[in-house]
Design a protein with these regions (language model features):
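Hydrophobic/aromatic-enriched cytosolic interaction surfaces used to assemble or bind macromolecules
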Residues: 1-286
């Protein structure tokens, strides 16, 4: 099972036995102000409400296990791509090198943070995808799951979780919008090449033209850096993702579609729209 805590709701899902689709899902709204995603300040302003909503959401998808993938808001986690010639073979030494590189780019003390990273070998060395969250922020989220009766064995920021739903063998842009952020990722051969999280003051009311304008600098940077053209674009988090298609197609010539496909969300009659479920679906089908 996977469960995402967003600013306005909790989403949960249970994967099918073959691991190819989410066969049950649930969504429960939170009272305004219950969760305020932030990298520094306390996120859970009404802990009782949050853990009760987690419990109700996961109970409704009916999983037998008490282990869950916890998906956190993107505004609470810093994700960075770092390049190295090489990393030390010992994990603790490698983490120390990653932490040192992160030090100057964070709005908080890296020594007070949890760091998780994945190293990708490239032709030029090592590319590291690092996720960083303040320890007290992470502990609050994990405690909410435990109070609800579940064990958060894996914890992911929403955008990194959502990437699990994308087939990115070809140059692929993934854009995910929420109430606080617009997250942009570009992948090729299922390797993450670019990752950015931008402040989003318009929330899900952002228009297709506005979204294309925000994304365009990242597209240009990718094309200039890698001499590749995007072939596919996936959108998540917008009720009318088709509204962004004409502007993005005009910029890139790439096909634009919803990130979560109908085949990945088995409950075709579910009242929960696919555009809300990217984090949960990606965490489970990756």
């Amino acid at each position: 099972m996977a469960c995402e805590i967003a600013a306005d709701r909790v989403l949960a899902g249970r994967v099918s036995d073959n691991g190819e689709m989410v066969e049950m899902c649930a969504s429960r709204e939170l009272a305004p102000g219950s969760v305020v995603p932030d990298m520094i300040e306390a996120n859970l302003r009404d802990r009782n409400s949050v853990y009760q909503t987690i419990r109700d959401s996961l109970a409704s998808v009916g999983g037998r296990s008490r282990d869950v993938i916890a998906v956190l808001p993107d505004a609470a986690v810093r994700v960075a791509l770092l390049g190295f010639d090489a990393l030390p073979a010992k994990p603790d030494e490698a983490e120390a090198v990653v932490r040192f590189r992160l030090k100057k780019s964070l709005p908080f003390d890296v020594d007070k943070a949890k760091v998780s990273y994945h190293a990708q070998i490239t032709g030029k060395g090592v590319r590291v995808v690092a996720a960083v969250v303040l320890s007290n922020v992470l502990e609050d989220y994990e405690a909410a799951f435990r109070e609800a009766g579940y064990t958060p064995g894996v914890v992911l920021p929403s955008m990194l979780a959502a990437l699990g739903a994308a087939n990115a063998e070809q140059p692929t842009l993934v854009v995910k919008v929420d109430a606080r952020t617009t997250s942009i990722a570009i992948l090729d051969k299922n390797q993450l090449l670019l990752f950015r999280t931008l402040e989003n003051s318009r929330g899900v009311t952002i228009t297709g033209e506005q979204l294309a304008e925000e994304v365009y600098p990242s597209i240009v940077f990718f094309q200039d850096t890698y001499s590749l053209n995007l072939e596919r674009i996936f959108i998540a988090g917008l009720p009318e993702s088709g509204g962004a298609a004409p502007a993005l197609q005009a910029q890139t010539g790439a096909e634009v579609r919803d990130l979560v496909s109908s085949s990945q969300l088995g409950m075709s009659t579910s009242p929960i729209p696919r555009w809300r479920m990217a984090g949960v679906v990606g965490a489970l089908v990756s």
